[in-house]
Structure formats: structure tokens, C-alpha cells
């Protein structure tokens, strides 16, 4: 399986998990200069920007540990652009950043994993 196929597989797993939890799928792999959002979901009236991370094992800290402050900043910027295209902003719209971390066969959903400050 190619790296792209692997990523798509785990993003689909994450999407199904979030949908079972009641979130509603909106978009996938939304790319902007400098960043990409893996999944965009709705949770009630809140936009949820989701980063999906997979690691085969936790030898180097696992999937969740791989989301650096720089990656968070890129996600924040991409989400800001996406919101602006819809006439919204962090100040006017309820939103959060979630992480779905998959390490080996274990999936962990981290709602509100980091903030938009």
C-alpha cells in the first residue's frame, strides 16, 4: 500500500469513528498554501478541524506526539483561510481542533486537542 493509500485508509477510519460519535462529515483533504486539513466535520453548530495521525508503534512517542507546534500553526492558518472563504472567522464562529491519533491498532480521539490562540 502506498503512503497516500495508507493515509486515505486511516482518514476513512477516523471519519467513520467520528460519524459514529455524532459528528457530520463536511470535507476531506482541504489544501491551502502552507497547510492541509485532513477532515472538516460539524459537531452541532461547531466546525471541527481534524488532524489524523498514524504511527505503526509508539517507539518515538506515538501518533499524537507527532503534532508539533509548527503543524498546529499550519492547521490554524488553513482553518482561518477556510473560514474566511465562508465569511467567518474564529471570532465569529464556534470551532475546535481535534486529533485522531492511531498508533498500531489503537485509535484515540482527542477533542479540542489544541486551541486557536
Curated annotation (Swiss-Prot):
Classification lineage: Bacteria, Pseudomonadati, Pseudomonadota, Gammaproteobacteria, Enterobacterales
Family affiliation: Belongs to the UPF0102 family.
Origin species: Yersinia pestis
HAMAP family xref list: UPF0102 (MF_00048)
CDD domains: PoNe_Nuclease
Pfam families documented for this protein: UPF0102
Name of this chain's protein: UPF0102 protein YPO3549/y0119/YP_3803
UniProt cross-references to PANTHER family, sorted A to Z: UPF0102 PROTEIN YRAN (PTHR34039:SF1)
GO molecular function, one term: nucleic acid binding
